[in-house]
Regions:
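Alpha-helical transmembrane segments and their immediate juxtamembrane cytosolic regions
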Residues: 1-280
Length: 280
C-alpha cells in the first residue's frame, strides 16, 4: 500500500514550521495568566512537578518503554545487542525514550528563566508589550527568524532553544494582552488567506527535502510561513473560537494525559503492524 513518493507527507510539511512555535507562544500566554494569581514559588513548584519530574525521573520508571520501540524501529536489537551489558542497554533505552518529552523539558527551562527575568524587569516589558500594533506584530518575524539561527542543539534537532525561547517570551509579554489578540482578530480573514497561500507555496517548494533540519527548518521562508500561521490562528481563534463547550472543557482536562501517552500508543501500534502483519 506504500509508494515511492509519500504524498501524505505534505501534512507534515504543513504543520512542522508553525505547530510547536504556536505551542510555545500559547505556553507563554498561559504562564502569564497563571502568574497573575500565583506566586513565583507556586509557579516553579507546579512546573517542576508537572514538567520536570515526568521528563526526567519518569524516563527511568516508564518512558524507557518508548525507547524500546524507538530502538526496535531502528533495528538496533538486530546488531549484536546481546553483547551490550543489561545496565548499559537500559540507560540507552532511557535516553531513547525522551521522544515528545523534549517539549516539557524545554518548557521547564524557559519557565525558570522567566522567573529570573521577572525579578529583573518588574513587569516593565509586559506593560510595553501591550502597545504592539499590527505592523509590529508582523515585523516580529525578523527577531523570530534571527532567534531560529541560534541555540540549536546538534544531532537532536528538536531542541531549538532560540526560536522556542523567544516565542515563549513573546507569548508572555505580548500576546497575553487582550488588546493584542483583538488587533489580530480584526485582520483574521486576511491573515488566514495569507497563511493558506504561503502553505501551498511552502509545500510545493520544499516537498521532498528534510523539513525538520537546516537549512529548511530555519530558512526565511519557513519562518515567514510559520509566523503567519501563528498570527492567523491566534486571531482566528480570538474571533471565532473564544468560547467553551462541554467538549472543549473535557479536552482541557485530558489534554496533558493525551500529550504524554499518544506517541507511545502510536509507536506500539506501528510496531505490531510492522512485525506481525503484512501492512508494510
Amino acid at each position: 500500500p506504500f509508494w515511492e513518493v509519500q504524498y501524505q507527507d505534505a501534512v507534515q510539511y504543513l504543520l512542522y514550521p508553525w505547530f510547536m512555535v504556536l505551542l510555545f507562544l500559547v505556553s507563554g500566554m498561559c504562564a502569564r495568566y497563571y502568574l497573575e494569581g500565583h506566586t513565583d514559588r507556586e509557579f516553579l513548584a507546579g512546573r517542576t512537578r508537572k514538567l520536570l519530574v515526568p521528563s526526567t525521573i519518569g524516563l527511568f520508571v516508564f518512558w524507557w518503554i518508548q525507547g524500546y520501540f524507538n530502538m526496535a524501529f531502528s533495528h538496533v536489537f538486530d546488531q549484536s545487542w546481546e553483547k551490550v551489558p543489561k545496565a548499559v542497554g537500559y540507560l540507552i533505552m532511557v535516553l531513547s525514550g525522551v521522544g515528545i518529552l523534549w517539549y516539557i523539558q524545554v518548557l521547564w527551562v524557559l519557565s525558570v528563566l522567566l522567573v529570573l527575568l521577572r525579578k529583573i524587569e518588574k513587569d516593565r516589558l509586559y506593560v510595553f508589550g501591550e502597545k504592539a500594533v499590527l505592523p509590529v506584530l508582523f515585523l516580529l518575524v525578523i527577531p523570530v527568524w534571527g532567534a531560529a539561527q541560534i541555540l540549536n542543539t546538534p544531532v537532536i534537532c528538536v531542541y531549538r532553544f532560540g526560536i522556542y525561547g523567544i516565542c515563549f517570551l513573546l507569548g508572555y509579554y505580548v500576546f497575553s494582552h487582550e488588546k493584542v489578540t483583538d488587533r489580530l482578530a480584526c485582520v483574521s480573514v486576511p491573515l488566514a488567506t495569507a497563511a493558506v497561500v504561503l502553505a501551498v507555496f511552502y509545500v510545493r517548494y520544499y516537498f521532498g527535502e528534510n523539513y525538520a533540519e537546516e537549512p529548511v527548518v530555519n530558512s526565511p521562508f519557513s519562518i515567514l510561513y510559520g509566523w503567519t500561521v501563528c498570527l492567523a490562528v491566534l486571531g482566528g481563534m480570538k474571533r471565532w473560537g473564544n468560547r467553551t463547550s462541554r467538549k472543549t472543557a473535557w479536552l482541557s482536562k485530558k489534554s496533558y494525559g493525551l500529550y504524554l501517552f499518544h506517541y507511545l500508543a502510536l509507536s506500539a501500534a506501528a510496531y505490531f503492524l510492522d512485525r506481525y502483519t503484512k501492512v508494510t
